[in-house]
């Protein structure tokens, strides 16, 4: 049998032990704990990166369950937006023989579907991938109440109605507005392209580019403006591709990128030709300034200096005028019918007829970096009609900051959220293409995917009471009765309107569920959502819900790498959820995810570690089974008369491990959970055996404590182990001993062994003599007595009091001089005792401890040990000598 067959046998055995369960969470007398995770987008199967973030929420859900909470962890499926519709459209074009930049057909076939034709319908994606996602996460052992799952978009009448209610309320609160705005735009999709719609260029925004006008023959050459007063460097040659275009009977020359953006920002721009500008620039270049100096570097390179005071002042005035024109032209109105005052007194509908320019400057917007949409379109900046959420509202921001002040999250996450609150501005939420909910009062537009996904956590609390399936086809509450009044009653506490009296019992149950489970106690997310979704999550909650329903905690994590490299299907360094679970099983996969990382730094899933976890978990289980046989053979009435020092060491150490593991759970540091629940517990058993520990019941306690602590990490396996071998209720272990006497003693033994091994004399000698002392030297006793009389802090803070330290060292100098002790050595001892007094307190009998563990010292050092007391030795500082 080869290595792979061995691993497969062990994995199959572990799989056979794992016991899953069906999760249903309803109102109870227990305190609740509500955990949510951003619903995944349904344009494919889940991959390991999804699982890494989901695991953070899942581990906490099981932990809170052990703490006695009634835990609700739901999950839905996001289908809103452009990606699904764009992929379906591209697939149709590809099947018709049209050329596409990426083969959607190949993507779908790689997901395991031979018949791709059904995927030309966006609805087919929505009906396919949520079910596969549920199957994957059930195999993973996720603690999810699947009754509460749903899909988004207007396919689901209930969620569609809920989102419309949300936006009616935002409009009523004055947080929505309509107008034109420069936005990243995809010419292929013919609509705005925001972060989630992009293949490349997330967080890239439009930037204004001010162009300077130069007259070249009969055309105006547009050159990017430098700082005012700085020279312009004009370069023409083979590499400079420009576009000749006409606007209002004036001919212009500009870089292609400028033209490609400008034509989406003003009307009446007529393309003439593309050409390479290669000429003698000085020949035919004219300029309207009062004082210009031209320096020719080469035939096609020159520097134009226009830095006279009068020119600079003129330019500053013109740029200020540009700003004023833009501010006036693009002021937002609160309805699509509104008229905006401008310098030219133009209506909103006609602002694209005006080129924003002055005598010497033109204003145009371009993306600050390249943006490519998921459709493959190279994006530009367009001046678009848009509905906006006014996240720039200062009163609203103030409420969000209050929410964040009281919200638990990591320091780097908090810092990014505060920064986000400050910089976030108006957010365009209307779309013309894709899937989603139509804006109720302007149905030509859809609500974007980042705006319909901010308060759906509230929908989880009542979904299972309204309909049974994902799409709202299996109705409990009739969909034809859905209205804002329904949601007002459930979520806003308003009175029930008479038309709904017949559904009072059901709707009251919905309201009670919301009031019981809300607010969100923990929101887990990838760090990439800090700058958008998590901001909007807080903004919308403080706008639409009472303060008692504001979120309590946010946890974010970094991206997941695979074997130290970025996951990528194109390079083959990729692992889907299903493939990971097939290769490593749920328990090893979950353990490996737990140790990957706990911060916003990128984490690393190492497949070799996952394989090792199969072996380690298998060994762990087998040790429990062997120990269980021995425990069953012992008399049920057998009691422990007294504990040996080895027993006390075990009890103290397992107590420390339990405490550290519980602290790690609370901090969501799951790598430390595995360290103290698994590795340190296994190490403890090995140590206990090495120091001749024999108490089977105490060994069993270690394994039981470890299994209880590991339940949130490996629930399906630990469920079986607890029920079968420990006959125990599902709860968290408690520390058995809160002392650390034997831990301190054994740390001393371990350090002693290290000193023996580090000695140069150890190599060629077979015997080590350890001489211990009972008393400190007289000069040290005097210093102890002197310092103990001083009333001062006994920690590192005291070092900052330079005057006090100088006085203290002066007072001990006579003691050191009398005993002929080196002043530096003596001062170091004084500072050590001043800051670390516990270090010099004897917590155990040094001679007895060494004598008891002498066999262990001999085994570890491979030397015969001789122990004696010696007057020259001091407590905790034995004299070590070697002999043949």
UniProtKB/Swiss-Prot annotation:
Q: Where is the signal peptide?
A: none
Q: Where are the transmembrane segments?
A: none
- Main localization is cytoplasm
**Similarity section:** Belongs to the class-I aminoacyl-tRNA synthetase family.
- What GO molecular-function term can you cite, just one? ATP binding
Say yes or no: keyword DNA-binding present.
Answer: no
List the CDD domains hit by this protein, alphabetically: LeuRS_core (cd00812)
Sequence motif 'HIGH' region, residues: 40-50
Biological classification of the source: Eukaryota, Fungi, Fungi incertae sedis, Microsporidia, Nosematidae
Q: Keyword ATP-binding: yes or no?
A: yes
For this protein, the record's InterPro entries field holds: aa-tRNA-synth_I_CS (IPR001412), aa-tRNA-synth_Ia (IPR002300), Leu-tRNA-synth_Ia_arc/euk (IPR004493), Rossmann-like_a/b/a_fold (IPR014729), tRNAsynth_Ia_anticodon-bd (IPR009080)
Catalysed conversion reaction: tRNA(Leu) + L-leucine + ATP = L-leucyl-tRNA(Leu) + AMP + diphosphate
Top enzyme class, one word, equals ligase
Organism whose genome encodes this protein: Vairimorpha ceranae (strain BRL01) (Microsporidian parasite)
Per UniProt, the keywords (alphabetical) are: Aminoacyl-tRNA synthetase, ATP-binding, Cytoplasm, Ligase, Nucleotide-binding, Protein biosynthesis
From the Swiss-Prot or TrEMBL record, state where the protein is found: Cytoplasm
List where the motif 'KMSKS' region lies: 566-570
The UniProt entry's GO CC annotations, sorted and at most eight, read: cytoplasm
One Gene Ontology biological process:
leucyl-tRNA aminoacylation
State the EC number(s): 6.1.1.4
| Pfam families registered for this protein in UniProt | tRNA-synt_1
Q: Which positions in this protein are listed as binding ATP?
A: 569
**The name this protein goes by in its record:** Probable leucine--tRNA ligase, cytoplasmic
